[in-house]
Regions:
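Residue-level signal for functionally critical sites in structured catalytic/ligand-binding pockets
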Residues: 2-9, 40-41, 61, 159-161
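N-terminal single-pass transmembrane signal-anchor helix
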Residues: 2-33
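Aromatic side chains
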Residues: 9, 32-35, 95, 126
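Extracellular/lumenal glycan-associated surfaces
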Residues: 34-37, 144
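Membrane-proximal N-terminal amphipathic helix
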Residues: 37-66
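Periplasmic/extracellular, small/polar-rich flexible segments of pilin-like filament-forming proteins
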Residues: 57-161
Length: 161
């Protein structure tokens, strides 16, 4: 009598492997989704801090009179669509890739009062000065990090040292 030698995997073994791969894929997909959303939140916080830091630097330049193109808030920071010492037209925002400024409300950085955060404006950064008294104001930099939450930093402008 001959014994037949079988090689390969049984159907049960293949089904077990497929089930394990399916479980790993399901767990990995959920983990990746959380990773992406947390990365976007961190990107907005980093961008808000960077813009606030740039405003602080420009405020120092304006106070020192070092840069003739930066003598007050309007010439240093500017508004949507204007040229200024801050030159935010080249600002790169990996979360919101819309063009900065340009006179429309679609840019990655808006020079207007912040609106409620929604899915449509998640990733947008709003730069809003309070009412000026002379050339002194508080500038709020707010970033919508998700559809329902935001991160903001307030920066003094023109108060002097």
């Amino acid at each position: 009598m001959h014994k037949s030698l079988q090689s390969g995997f049984s159907l049960i073994e293949l089904l077990v492997v497929v089930a394990i791969i399916g479980i790993l894929a399901a767990v990995g997909t959920v983990g990746y989704g959380n990773y992406v959303s947390q990365t976007k939140v961190k990107a907005v916080k980093t961008n808000v801090d960077a813009v606030a830091g740039a405003i602080n630097t420009l405020e120092g330049l304006a106070q020192a009179g070092v840069d003739p193109a930066c003598s007050n808030y309007t010439t240093c920071i500017g508004t949507s669509g204007s040229t200024s010492a801050m030159n935010l037209a080249n600002f790169k925002n990996p979360y919101n890739t819309s063009t900065t400024g340009g006179g429309t409300a679609t840019g990655a950085i808006q020079f207007q009062a912040a609106v409620a955060c929604t899915a449509a404006n998640a990733g947008t950064i709003y730069v809003t000065p309070s009412a000026f008294v002379g050339d002194v104001a508080t500038v709020t930099v707010l970033g919508c990090d998700t559809a329902s939450s935001s991160y903001n930093v307030s920066v003094g402008w023109g108060a002097g040292p």
